[in-house]
């Protein structure tokens, strides 16, 4: 994704919402 809000802990996913247990919600 272009401009992620933050990254998840272990998998470095693009997150635009919450990070729960190392994946995006």
Swiss-Prot record:
Role according to the record: Micromolar concentrations of PiVIIA increase the magnitude of the macroscopic calcium current in DRG neurons from rat. An increase, even modest of the calcium current, may have a significant impact in the excitability and electrical activity of neurons, and may set up PiVIIA as a member of the pharmacological family of the gamma-conotoxins.
Keyword Cytoplasm among record annotations: no
4-hydroxyproline PTM positions: 4
Family statement drawn from the similarity comment of this UniProt entry: Belongs to the conotoxin O2 superfamily.
Tissue: Expressed by the venom duct.
Comment, domains: The presence of a 'disulfide through disulfide knot' structurally defines this protein as a knottin.
Note: Negative results: does not modify sodium, potassium and acid sensing ionic channel (ASIC) currents.
Membrane is among the record's keywords: no
Modification type 4-carboxyglutamate: residues: 13, 20
Keywords on record: Calcium channel impairing toxin, Disulfide bond, Gamma-carboxyglutamic acid, Hydroxylation, Ion channel impairing toxin, Knottin, Neurotoxin, Secreted, Toxin
One GO CC term, this protein: extracellular region
Subcellular location as annotated: Secreted
Main location: secreted
MF terms (GO), sorted A to Z: calcium channel regulator activity; toxin activity
Protein name per Swiss-Prot or TrEMBL: Gamma-conotoxin PiVIIA
Disulfide linkage: 1-15, 8-19, 14-24
Residue spans crossing the bilayer: none
């Amino acid at each position: 994704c272009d401009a992620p809000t933050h990254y998840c802990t272990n998998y470095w996913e693009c997150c635009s919402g919450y990070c729960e247990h190392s994946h995006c919600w």
